[in-house]
Amino acid sequence: MIAKLKGILDSITDSYLIIDINGVGYQVYSSGKTLMKLIKEEGSIVSLFIETHVREDRIHLFGFLDNTEKVAFNMLQSVSGIGTKMALHILSNLTPHQLQIAISSQNRHQLKAISGVGPKLIDRLMIELRDKVANINTIANNTSLATLSTDSNTHDNILSDAITALIALGISRAEATQILSDIYALSPSISVNELVRTALQRRAK
């Protein structure tokens, strides 16, 4: 089960993105809001929380920048008649916080403004999620604690991520390790993306 992906953002379409990890491209479906936030990050290293759906003939990956959106995605699917496509459509129009407020305050108008969301579906959302939406942040925070240690930008993690990125671009591990170590020694507070960009610039000279 894939729970998280970290790699180079290869490309973005209007419904999914492709993350390149060691030369393998993973197709990840995301909400419109997530895709818009990532549109300027093409070529950079990104990290996404993943919800994996396994079917008889295929595997679908759904990606989220934060765990709150992932929790909201799964919560929406607990409502009768809502599948992955509609859940992403709703989250393309409302943030998890906006969804939480709309349902808690029984604001039907905010949900009605979303195309494809009719009166009957709104009724089900209001009834079935009324007692659940207040827990979105709590659930998200609790599940995030399990992966917190793997997200820390320690020296080893930064170098490892940068090396992976350069290898994906066709640079040998030995060369990537040497050039990145030299740069990192001079700028220990540098981010992964800055480290990769600096390495590519130095290599091009």
From Swiss-Prot:
Family per record: Belongs to the RuvA family.
- Under which name does UniProt file this protein? Holliday junction branch migration complex subunit RuvA
Q: Which InterPro entries does the entry mention?
A: DNA_helicase_Holl-junc_RuvA_I, Hlx-hairpin-Hlx_DNA-bd_motif, NA-bd_OB-fold, RuvA, RuvA_2-like, RuvA_C, RuvA_C_sf
Location of the region described as Domain II in the Swiss-Prot/TrEMBL record: 66-144
Region called Domain III, residue ranges: 154-205
Which keywords label this protein?
Cytoplasm, DNA damage, DNA recombination, DNA repair, DNA-binding
- Give the quaternary structure: Homotetramer. Forms an RuvA(8)-RuvB(12)-Holliday junction (HJ) complex. HJ DNA is sandwiched between 2 RuvA tetramers; dsDNA enters through RuvA and exits via RuvB. An RuvB hexamer assembles on each DNA strand where it exits the tetramer. Each RuvB hexamer is contacted by two RuvA subunits (via domain III) on 2 adjacent RuvB subunits; this complex drives branch migration. In the full resolvosome a probable DNA-RuvA(4)-RuvB(12)-RuvC(2) complex forms which resolves the HJ.
Any single Gene Ontology cellular-component annotation: cytoplasm
Task: Enumerate the residue ranges of region (Domain I).
Answer: 1-65
Q: Which organism is it from?
A: Orientia tsutsugamushi (strain Ikeda) (Rickettsia tsutsugamushi)
Transmembrane regions: none
Entry keyword annotation includes DNA repair? yes
Positions the record marks as coiled coil are none
Q: What is recorded about the domains? A: Has three domains with a flexible linker between the domains II and III and assumes an 'L' shape. Domain III is highly mobile and contacts RuvB.
Annotated region Flexible linker: the residues are: 145-153
A GO MF term: four-way junction DNA binding
Role = The RuvA-RuvB-RuvC complex processes Holliday junction (HJ) DNA during genetic recombination and DNA repair, while the RuvA-RuvB complex plays an important role in the rescue of blocked DNA replication forks via replication fork reversal (RFR). RuvA specifically binds to HJ cruciform DNA, conferring on it an open structure. The RuvB hexamer acts as an ATP-dependent pump, pulling dsDNA into and through the RuvAB complex. HJ branch migration allows RuvC to scan DNA until it finds its consensus sequence, where it cleaves and resolves the cruciform DNA.
Tell me where in or outside the cell this protein is found: Cytoplasm
- A GO biological process this protein is involved in? DNA repair
